[in-house]
């Protein structure tokens, strides 16, 4: 039973690694994505679409909880993307 649980855990970690792309800066991410996360674990995440969580753009391009919004959208005071 322990072996099965360990195999499941390893499989889940491998899948998470495939889905997310680790990054150190914006330059590590492809177009339409930003580098966001904690100081120890940042991943390339897509820019926010209409109604999705966001962080306002900043000159340092440092984001912790999510990316800025896609073009033509703005990040509202409640951190949701909406029409500009």
Swiss-Prot record:
GO terms for molecular function: toxin activity. Expressed by the venom gland. Coiled coil: none annotated. Pfam families: Prokineticin. Disulfide bonds join 23-35, 29-44, 34-67, 54-75, 69-81. This is U8-theraphotoxin-Hhn1a. The keyword Signal applies. It comes from Cyriopagopus hainanus (Chinese bird spider). The lineage of its organism: Eukaryota, Metazoa, Ecdysozoa, Arthropoda, Chelicerata. GO terms for cellular component: extracellular region. The keyword Repressor does not apply. Belongs to the AVIT (prokineticin) family. Gene3D superfamilies: Lipase, subunit A (2.10.80.10). Keywords: Disulfide bond, Secreted, Signal, Toxin. It is found in: Secreted. Residues 1-21 form the signal peptide.
């Amino acid at each position: 039973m322990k072996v099965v649980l360990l195999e499941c855990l390893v499989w889940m970690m491998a899948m998470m690694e495939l889905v997310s792309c680790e990054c150190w800066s914006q330059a590590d991410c492809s177009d339409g994505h930003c580098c966001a996360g904690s100081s120890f674990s940042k991943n390339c995440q897509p820019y926010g679409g209409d109604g999705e969580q966001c962080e306002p753009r900043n000159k340092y391009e440092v984001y912790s909880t999510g990316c800025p919004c896609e073009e033509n959208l703005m990040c509202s005071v409640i951190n949701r993307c909406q029409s500009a």
